[in-house]
């Protein structure tokens, strides 16, 4: 009798154990497998961006909008950290930073962007664009996209960052200053006896660049978020520049511009127009429609577009 009771109890314990095992397997099949995937989807992607912009520059403000829009579109799964001028030490260049993985993206100043693509030297030439709208059409359109695709294969160009027109300061040694640089000099009363000209000759463009290998590791959705956010921030930046001319802000910051009727203004304007034509003449064999982005007036109705 005792042996039968023992056997019965043993069988009961076995059934309980078997039931627990089956329940564990069932739970693993229904709820266990997706857990790692869920955790991965919630993992944040951090994008560090190095620039040589001041915090109040036009280019930095566009990148701030880009960062905000990207975080919103990705529902906080992508976070952008911007670094302005002075936050990165030399001797390493921005190209070195992105190659070493110190940052994910860099906004290249002229010397470094020319190092990656010598043809980008064109963007330092005066009077390439006939209006602010022409600049926007160029960098937002197919011509700008083609120019970005000429970067070395190991790099990917997200887009061109607009930083406004440069201003010519003549204190005995003429030099071009960005909006942010001139604003600082005006606010700190550091212009002294310098003469400043608003020639609308050079518009500052810097490519936002990352490694192609890093870009390829992103999902299609992440790439789309980045591209859409950058494009929307670009549109907003140009709308703000059109709505309120940055030169007006400089005037309120203590900057005084020479009138365009003065001999000095006329002299510099003619000088830089000649510089542009000489550059085009020397590079006529290599410049295509998108390397020479002078935008002419729209053709009259019925006329066909001509290559610039």
Locations of regions flagged by a protein language model:
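N-terminal secretory signal peptides that target proteins for export/translocation
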Residues: 1-11
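Intrinsically disordered, low-complexity regions of eukaryotic proteins
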Residues: 4, 18, 305-308
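Short, solvent-exposed secondary-structure boundary motifs
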Residues: 7, 147-152
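Sec-dependent N-terminal signal peptides
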Residues: 9-22
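N-terminal secretory/targeting leader peptides
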Residues: 30-133, 151-154, 158-308
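Signature of the catalytic double-stranded beta-helix
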Residues: 137-148
């Amino acid at each position: 009798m005792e042996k039968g009771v023992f056997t019965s109890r043993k069988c009961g314990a076995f059934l309980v154990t078997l039931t627990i095992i089956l329940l564990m397997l069932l739970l693993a099949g229904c709820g266990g497998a997706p857990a790692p995937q869920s955790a991965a989807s919630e993992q944040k992607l951090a994008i560090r961006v190095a620039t040589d912009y001041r915090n109040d520059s036009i280019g930095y403000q566009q990148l701030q909008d880009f960062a905000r829009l990207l975080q919103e579109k990705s529902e906080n799964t992508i976070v952008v950290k911007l670094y302005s001028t002075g936050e990165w030490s030399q001797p390493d260049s921005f190209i070195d930073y992105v190659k070493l993985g110190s940052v994910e993206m860099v906004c290249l100043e002229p010397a470094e962007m020319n190092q990656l693509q010598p043809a980008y030297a064109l963007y330092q030439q005066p009077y390439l664009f006939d209006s602010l709208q022409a600049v926007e059409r160029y960098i937002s359109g197919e011509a700008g996209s083609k120019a970005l695709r000429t970067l070395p294969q190991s790099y990917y160009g997200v887009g061109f960052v607009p930083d406004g027109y440069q201003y010519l300061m003549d204190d005995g040694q003429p030099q071009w200053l960005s909006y942010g640089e001139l604003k600082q000099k005006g606010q700190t009363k550091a212009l002294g006896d310098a003469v400043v000209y608003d020639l609308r000759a050079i518009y500052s463009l810097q490519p936002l660049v990352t490694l192609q290998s890093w870009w390829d590791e992103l999902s299609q959705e992440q790439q789309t978020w980045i591209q859409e956010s950058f494009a929307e921030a670009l549109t907003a930046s140009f709308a703000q520049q059109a709505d309120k001319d940055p030169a007006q802000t400089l005037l309120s910051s203590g900057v005084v511009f020479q009138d365009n009727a003065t001999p000095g203004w006329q002299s510099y304007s003619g000088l830089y127009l000649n510089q542009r034509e000489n550059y085009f003449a020397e590079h006529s064999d290599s410049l295509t429609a998108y390397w020479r982005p002078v935008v002419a007036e729209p053709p009259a109705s019925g006329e066909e577009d001509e290559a610039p």
